[in-house]
C-alpha cells in the first residue's frame, strides 16, 4: 500500500480528515480479506492502494464506500460510519467502479444528464465533459467510444454529482500508456475541483 506520509507527524486537525480507519478487518469465511488496516486521508489528498490481485484493495474501497460491511475496526468517511450512512452521505461520494455498466445508446451528454438527475446539486454537464476531456465526444453514443473514453465517462459520472470525496477503483483500466499518464496528471485537477465541505 502506498499513501500519504504518516499523518501522526503532521499537524492535522480532525476537521481536515475525510477518511479515518483503525484496525479495519474483513473476513469472508475462512479468508481474512483485510487484516487490520490503519489509515487517515486529509481533504485534498490523493491516496492510493497498491498491491497484487486479491490483496483486499477493492474490498477496502467498498467498505469505505458503504457497499460492504466490515468484520471489525472503526471507519469514518466524511465523519460518518459507512455502515450507518444514509442518502445525504452517499450523495457526497463519487465512485468509479472497477468495471462499468454504461448505457450504450445514450450519448456522453445524455449519460451525464441522467446521472446528474440523481443528485440534489449536480455540476454543470458541460463543465464535467471538459474536465474529463470528452468535449469532442459529447454527442457521441457510448457504444462508439473507445475503452479509455468510456473510463473517462465513468469518471465524469462520478464527478457530476459534485462530490466531496471520489473513490476510483482501477480507473485507468483500458487506457493506453499515454492516456494513463494523462489521467494521472489530471488527478490533482479533479481533486481540487471537489466541492468544499459545507
Positions of the model-derived regions?
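Conserved ABC ATPase signature
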Residues: 141-145
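Helix-to-loop junction immediately C-terminal to a conserved catalytic motif
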Residues: 65
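Catalytic Walker B motif of ABC-type/P-loop ATPase nucleotide-binding domains
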Residues: 166-170, 175
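Conserved ABC transporter NBD signature motif
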Residues: 73-81, 89
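Conserved ABC ATPase "signature" region
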Residues: 113, 117, 122-138
